[in-house]
């Protein structure tokens, strides 16, 4: 059978599904689920079995394939042992859960007639149809809040900006956008110029910085667009959530997983600092996960809204960042007049390393750092029982990152030379090349 005939058959099957849907008892389609932990549902249509409903629950994957361990087993040999999985990401309590489908198959999983591709994940929207051709089709149903403030001035032809809200920031909202040429999904950050002090704030800083960045551990910008009152940044769709949702799910992150997470963050920071760029707002929410299917995943630094390019010999003196992650030298600027700030010693790249120490402490313990009085300065408090299972090297690295005196704080280079990384250096490098760089290069061809 040629490709066209195959595609026509699939469309015919989908049409048949839609006909069957019109005959379904509406009570079974009620979006008000009886179970609190049910986030969405998949209605299964197959000629070889009766209609089935699969519930997508909080922190539970729904797997489909030939394996008898799958939530829904496909009997046809054209299906893969593990064909696809549906999983959810909960960003925070104020946001609707985001539900994704990861294609794990050799023969392909199709979303609304478009091939997803093995190893790729897509965001699912209410009414989407997943197809495992010649096996079964799955209608996705999810009730989510419609953004009443949705409005945009994008007049370009390449993208269609949908009302699927992915995130909310101080000056912006992030929506799902579709590439009209390829059907690919993107995250569109819409910045409201009326909410910022000057129109040049983001245009001169965030986009100036993002335009010249090209690194596996830094968010990739595909396009930008400028209108009278809005600024648009079209970024790669990242489908694994962020480190905050990841930590919330696990409670604490195993040390071996934290090791590779920290290694990647440092690769991104090394790249930024070599170009004299300071992020200034590193936190769990601004570090994304490319995929949640494994303990080995790509880490992506995002949100460069307050990032700055440092001029040689100059220090920064603006009070910015998130208090929980902010370095002491930035905290000391709070409440000071502009003259006092300018006369202060300011701060530099060291602030990103303090934030990194807070992140590492949070990942390993699930709590924010606390300090005990020391002889010369406050010491990181590791008395909580959770630290008994954490290595001495990991705690030593945290202590060197959370030095209140900036010159005493570890640099990126010192971090990567620390025994916690150094004793695993060759393995970390190989893992980074084979599991991060190689797949990414292949996906961007």
Swiss-Prot record:
Function in brief: Probable protein kinase required for meiotic recombination.
Organism: Schizosaccharomyces pombe (strain 972 / ATCC 24843)
Keyword Transferase attributed: yes
Superkingdom of the source species: Eukaryota
Active-site residues (renumbered): 281 (proton acceptor)
Position of the signal peptide: none
One of the record's GO molecular function terms: ATP binding
EC number: 2.7.11.1
Binding locations of ATP: 166-174, 189
Name of the gene: mek1
The keyword Cell division belongs to this UniProt entry's keyword annotation: no
PANTHER family xref list: SERINE/THREONINE-PROTEIN KINASE
Protein kinase domain location: 160-421
Residue ranges of every copy of the FHA domain listed in the record: 62-116
Entry protein name: Meiosis-specific serine/threonine-protein kinase mek1
